[in-house]
Structures are given as structure tokens and as C-alpha cells.
């Protein structure tokens, strides 16, 4: 099997250590400062069990999210969208957003951040922490009332 020429990477989800966000939400980190020098994007996948989500939050960088599998509800600012596999969002830095699994099976998203140093700010509390740090484990049951204006 051919290996990529460094500093290139080939990432296989089945061998990547998962980041358990709690309550049935698991992240598989792909490209980031943990494995790539000089990267300008941070990428990965997050798998949501039925009825779960991540609280309304914002980032210090832009983010694009592709629904890879399942059915999602995305809240972006004051707008709410139902999405299915193959549909995507783009969220500018600083805009509150969240994703919930609205389906009966697993929902998987593929995310891309436009930066190397990514933070998450929880809208309800104003708490900011580094993406995928120990503080970044606040997943839980999907909250239908998540809206940016309810911060």
C-alpha cells in the first residue's frame, strides 16, 4: 500500500481515537494541530445518537458542516433548517449555531473549520474554551428551544 508523502495525511476513521462528547455524541477528529504542522483548516466528523445535539454555540472561525448521514435540524442565528444527507451549511465566525439529530437513526456530520486554533463559546453561558478540549464535552439531549435570540 502506498503511503502519502509527508506532510500529507491519509486518515482512516476506524483507527482514529474518538472524542466522547457525552450523552451519545462522539467526534472523530481528522486534521488539526494535534496531527498536522501548518494546517489552515481543522476537520472531523461527529456522530449523534437519536435525540441528541450540541448546545447553541459560536466559534472564532468560520465553519462548514455537511450532513453525511441521517437527518439533522440546524439552528443558524435565528433560523432553523431541516437537513438530510448531502446538504450543508456555512456559518461565519461569531454566529451562534447548533445541530440536532431529528431522525430515528444515527446522524453524522463532517465539519471544516477555517483555522488551526478553534474555540467554542457556549451562547447560554458565554464560556469559551478550546475546541476538543476537556471542557468541550457538553453534548446532551436535543433542546428544541435553542435559538440565538434566547441566549
Task: Go through each PLM region and give its residues.
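Short acidic-glycine-tyrosine-enriched beta hairpin
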Residues: 78-93
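A short, N-terminal "cap"/entry segment at the start of jelly-roll beta-barrel domains
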Residues: 1-40, 124-151
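Conserved short histidine dyad/triad with adjacent acidic residue
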Residues: 27-31, 44-59
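A short hydrophobic beta-strand segment most commonly corresponding to one strand
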Residues: 46, 90, 105-121
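Short, charged/polar surface micro-motifs in flexible loops or helix N-caps
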Residues: 35-39, 48-52, 71-73, 115-118
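Glycine- and acidic-residue-biased ligand/ion/polar-headgroup-sensing regions
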Residues: 62-63, 67-72
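Short beta-strand His + acidic residue motifs that chelate non-heme Fe in jelly-roll/DSBH
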Residues: 54-56, 74-75, 91, 97-103
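A generic "binding-loop/recognition-motif" signal
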Residues: 50-52, 60-61, 79, 95-96, ...
Amino acid at each position: 500500500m502506498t503511503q502519502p508523502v509527508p506532510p500529507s495525511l491519509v486518515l482512516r476513521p476506524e483507527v482514529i481515537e474518538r472524542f466522547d462528547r457525552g450523552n451519545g455524541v462522539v467526534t472523530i477528529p481528522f486534521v488539526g494541530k494535534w496531527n498536522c504542522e501548518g494546517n489552515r483548516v481543522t476537520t472531523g466528523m461527529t456522530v449523534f445518537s437519536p435525540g441528541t445535539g450540541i448546545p447553541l454555540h459560536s466559534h472564532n472561525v468560520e465553519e462548514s458542516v455537511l450532513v453525511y448521514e441521517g437527518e439533522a435540524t440546524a439552528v443558524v442565528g435565528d433560523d432553523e433548517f431541516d437537513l438530510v444527507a448531502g446538504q450543508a451549511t456555512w456559518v461565519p465566525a461569531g454566529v451562534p449555531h447548533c445541530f440536532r439529530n431529528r431522525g430515528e437513526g444515527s446522524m453524522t456530520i463532517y465539519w471544516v473549520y477555517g483555522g488551526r486554533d478553534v474555540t467554542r463559546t457556549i451562547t447560554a453561558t458565554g464560556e469559551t474554551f478550546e475546541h476538543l478540549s476537556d471542557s468541550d464535552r457538553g453534548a446532551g439531549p436535543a433542546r428544541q428551544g435553542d435559538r440565538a435570540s434566547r441566549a
